[in-house]
Design a protein with these regions (language model features):
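A short, compositionally biased micro-patch
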Residues: 49, 127, 173, 294-295
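Conserved active-site carboxylates
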Residues: 177
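Short loop/edge segments at beta-strand edges and connector loops
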Residues: 85, 172-174
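N-terminal lobe of the biotin/lipoate ligase/transferase fold
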Residues: 2-163, 234
């Protein structure tokens, strides 16, 4: 009931009377009073005025299931939310839930990860209260060979959401990093369980530095946060909702064709590598060239002095000639 009351208070501009809450949820005034007090204890500022009722004044920056559900506007993402104060890795937990039958659109979110996962087995620093660490479960009926494009769909959604929230450009470093001022603010890790021609499930992990004021010496030259970039604090649950709204939109476009043909132009407009000299760290043979955008299959187009090459996602990294981007 706490979540339902919070949702109603969010949706109402003025006051909601105690009687209205009792009638709507079929509970006593004492039960309403207890739920309101629980919300206040969690950090919600709720004004109570005699003969008027209750009004939500402000919300805290917390990632509870009640907060996330009450802010939810998506159609199918987040019907089931698994919130944890601490997990080893949201990707690991999401895979477990997927294998146990969690429905499409379920997501795992945590205040802290003890063993966050990055690309190619790297760790991902995930301190409590500082960022958004979450993983979405997808169960699409697509060719497993097309699954890697979902990473690019996710990057586009995160780029748009951060740009919309902060008013600052958040670009994409192909294929899976979000960049502000030349530094990484978000990483994306997509993992799949599949048969030869069938996807069991896909999990899409997103890690965003939001409130961080500083970083360890070994990554401070390449990492940033929304706070560092704007000197403002952001309500993380609101950003989560913006990301999932954008993702639903872009993902459904992707599913229509199982490629990025409907998203290429928008993706390229967010691509920080676009028309930049890049170094492709291909294990077989590294090379340099100019990035010219992506193909409908999500490959990075790189023009070298002798030919045009198409770079696929996977074990290949792309760096700027003079730095990370």
């Amino acid at each position: 009931m706490k979540t339902e009351i919070l949702t109603l208070l969010r949706e109402t501009d003025g006051y909601v009377s105690g009687q209205e809450l009792c009638e709507k949820f079929g509970v006593s005034r004492t039960a309403v009073w207890k739920a309101i007090n629980q919300l206040k204890e969690a950090g919600y500022e709720i004004e109570a005025v005699q003969n008027k009722g209750y009004r939500l004044v402000s919300v805290p920056d917390i990632l509870s299931e009640s907060e996330l559900q009450s802010a939810r506007k998506t159609r199918w993402i987040g019907e089931k939310i698994a919130f944890f104060d601490v997990v080893d890795s949201t990707n690991t937990r999401a895979k477990q839930l997927a294998e146990e039958g969690a429905p499409n659109g379920t997501y795992v979110i945590a205040e802290r990860q003890d063993a966050g996962k990055g690309r190619r087995g790297r760790g991902f620093d995930s301190p409590a209260g500082q960022g958004i660490w979450m993983t979405l479960v997808l169960k699409p009926e697509i060719d497993p060979n097309h699954a890697s494009m979902i990473t690019l769909v996710t990057a586009l959604a995160v780029s748009k959401a951060i740009t919309d929230m902060t008013g600052r450009p958040a670009g994409i470093k192909w294929p899976n990093d979000i960049i502000m001022s030349g530094k990484k603010v978000c990483g994306i890790l997509t993992e799949m369980s599949a048969q030869f021609d069938y996807v069991n499930h896909i999990v899409v992990g997103i890690g965003i530095n939001v409130q961080n004021k500083s970083f360890p010496k070994d990554i401070e030259s390449v990492a940033t946060s929304l706070f560092i970039e704007t000197k403002e604090h952001y309500h993380r649950a609101e950003l989560v909702e913006l990301i999932w709204e954008a993702f639903e939109h872009y993902y459904e476009i992707f599913l229509q064709t199982e490629d990025l043909s409907g998203l290429v132009n928008e993706y390229n407009s967010h691509l920080v590598n676009m028309h930049q000299q890049v170094k492709v760290l291909d294990p077989k043979e590294p090379f340099e060239g100019k990035a010219m955008g992506i193909t409908p299959k999500g490959e990075l187009i790189v023009d070298t002095w002798e030919s045009r090459k198409l770079v696929s996602t996977g074990e290949v990294s792309v760096r700027g000639i003079y730095g990370y981007v």
